[in-house]
Amino acid sequence: MNPEYDYLFKLLLIGDSGVGKSCLLLRFADDTYTESYISTIGVDFKIRTIELDGKTIKLQIWDTAGQERFRTVTSSYYRGAHGIIVVYDVTDQESYANVKQWLQEIDRYASENVNKLLVGNKSDLTTKKVVDNTTAKEFADSLGVPFLETSAKNATNVEQAFMTMAAEIKKRMGPGAASGGERPNLKIDSTPVKSASGGCC
């Protein structure tokens, strides 16, 4: 068993371009935020280790490009993901409407029992909000998927989103699931593709 951690979970952030995926990752992994927006090119990732129920869990979080032209690059990262976080922008109705399309991508490329989490980001922009919390919650409930509204800018629910995902995966793995080093299905077999760092908006 690897002494550094008990579990290694690979998470994937997906959603339309500009919804704040990179911002959520920066806030969770580095506790930083930037107003500038630089589009993620292809795929980027960060690692953060957390403690959950007395276990050390290493989270490898992959941030994907939302643009159509990168879909072929990013689709390969669905395989082997333990959890996928679908992000939309609460001030952008189209990004919410496209959640269904992203869920289809998960069905097409990810493993059958992958954990999912729906996140409505930019909750701090209350006056510009167009996607109703209740509507999104009901949609998530109909899929049996946890739902949270977050703000990468003021750190609202960001920690909770990733911790919820880690807890759901750990629950699915069950007490018999071994460490990242022992079980092949917990090993990360993707070759890291380092990209230009994604900015935020």
Curated annotation (Swiss-Prot):
Residues 64-83 are annotated as: Switch 2 region. GO terms for biological process: autophagosome assembly; endoplasmic reticulum to Golgi vesicle-mediated transport; Golgi organization; intracellular protein transport; positive regulation of glycoprotein metabolic process; regulation of autophagosome assembly. Prenylated; by GGTase II, only after interaction of the substrate with Rab escort protein 1 (REP1). Its cofactor is Mg(2+). Interacts with MICAL1 and MICAL2. Interacts (in GTP-bound form) with MICALCL, MICAL1 and MILCAL3. Interacts with GDI1; the interaction requires the GDP-bound state. Interacts with CHM/REP1; the interaction requires the GDP-bound form and is necessary for prenylation by GGTase II. Interacts with RabGAP TBC1D20. Interacts (in GDP-bound form) with lipid phosphatase MTMR6 (via GRAM domain); the interaction regulates MTMR6 recruitment to the endoplasmic reticulum-Golgi intermediate compartment. Interacts (in GDP-bound form) with lipid phosphatase MTMR7. Belongs to the small GTPase superfamily. Rab family. Rab-1B binds GTP and GDP and possesses intrinsic GTPase activity. This is Ras-related protein Rab-1B. It comes from Rattus norvegicus.
